[in-house]
Amino acid sequence: MEYFMVPTQKVPSLQHFRKTEKEVIGGLCSLANIPLTPETQRDQERRIRREIANSNERRRMQSINAGFQSLKTLIPHTDGEKLSKAAILQQTAEYIFSLEQEKTRLLQQNTQLKRFIQELSGSSPKRRRAEDKDEGIGSPDIWEDEKAEDLRREMIELRQQLDKERSVRMMLEEQVRSLEAHMYPEKLKVIAQQVQLQQQQEQVRLLHQEKLEREQQQLRTQLLPPPAPTHHPTVIVPAPPPPPSHHINVVTMGPSSVINSVSTSRQNLDTIVQAIQHIEGTQEKQELEEEQRRAVIVKPVRSCPEAPTSDTASDSEASDSDAMDQSREEPSGDGELP
């Protein structure tokens, strides 16, 4: 009877074959949309997890290899020399140690040089100043010149900085305005309307002021005396008795304050009207005076001054003693009223 011994190395190969067979079956079932058994589903999940782990491990190894390559470029080595990862790490550690030693040595040298410079330049500035003073009074002060130059340079730099800041600020303001114009067009419209309203109000106010000034000028021109009659026969006629003539004569003889203030001018007008009514007396008397005035205008220029005397004489006979006094005062020019 013969016995066949199965070697132990073939057992894992059979297990591996069975696993691969199950994976293939699971993949075919997933492709054919066939419901999987629980065992095949577990195998498929394991396969997916294994693939994910393999990809992560691959990435990790790639990053490690890249780090070793960068270290290899940093450390001193000959071109074409092949170095393992352990050799690269060892050489980098040695290189870092040597760099630290070099750093400490340079720091010690730097401190020694600083001390040497301080020892040499400890009393030198005082000696130099004393020597400069001993040389002569008219020697130029170098320190002041250097300070002045430094100040000038600082001023120039500050001006340049200010110009740059101004240009930047103007650019930013323009950008802000453009953004506001894009984002808030309604706000700009409201502002424009407000500006237009303000301009309209200002125009109305100016027109009102101009109107008031024109009215004041008209009042002043009305209150001013007429030009002195010289050559025209119709203008040479003395102040006629009707109300307008008396009004003009009395106001011109009044003070300057009467022309300036409106209230005083009104009071003067009232008093003038009362005086004129008192002088005229009755309506019949006015008609007679108008006829006499027409007769005076028709006469030549030489007979004009005689007309008021005859008129006043006829008026004095018909009027009272008080009215006659007032009529004499007015042609003579003394027409001031209380």
UniProtKB/Swiss-Prot annotation:
Where is each bHLH domain found? 48-99
Q: Known Pfam families for this protein?
A: HLH
Q: Which SMART domains does the UniProt entry name for this protein? A: HLH
The main location is nucleus
- Write out the entry's keywords from A to Z: Activator, DNA-binding, Isopeptide bond, Nucleus, Phosphoprotein, Repeat, Transcription, Transcription regulation, Ubl conjugation
Query: Sorted alphabetically, which PROSITE patterns does this protein's record hold?
Result: BHLH
Tell me how this protein assembles.
Efficient DNA binding requires dimerization with another bHLH protein. Homodimer.
Annotated segments matching region Disordered: 118-141, 283-338
Q: Where is this region: Leucine-zipper 2?
A: 151-179
* Function, in words: Transcription factor that activates both viral and cellular genes by binding to the symmetrical DNA sequence 5'-CAGCTG-3'.
Provide any one GO MF term from the record. Answer: protein homodimerization activity
Question: Its Gene Ontology biological processes?
Answer: cellular response to dexamethasone stimulus; DNA damage response, signal transduction by p53 class mediator; negative regulation by host of viral transcription; negative regulation of cell population proliferation; negative regulation of cyclin-dependent protein serine/threonine kinase activity; negative regulation of DNA binding; negative regulation of DNA-templated transcription; negative regulation of gene expression
User: Where is it found, in Gene Ontology cellular component terms?
Assistant: chromatin; mitochondrion; nucleoplasm; nucleus; transcription repressor complex
Where can the Glycyl lysine isopeptide (Lys-Gly) (interchain with G-Cter in SUMO2) cross-link be found? 147, 187, 189, 285
Biased composition (Basic and acidic residues) is annotated at: 283-294
**Leucine-zipper 1: region residues:** 100-120
Report the locations given in the UniProt record.
Answer: Nucleus
Task: Give the modified residues of type Phosphoserine.
Answer: 123-124, 139
Protein name listed in UniProt: Transcription factor AP-4
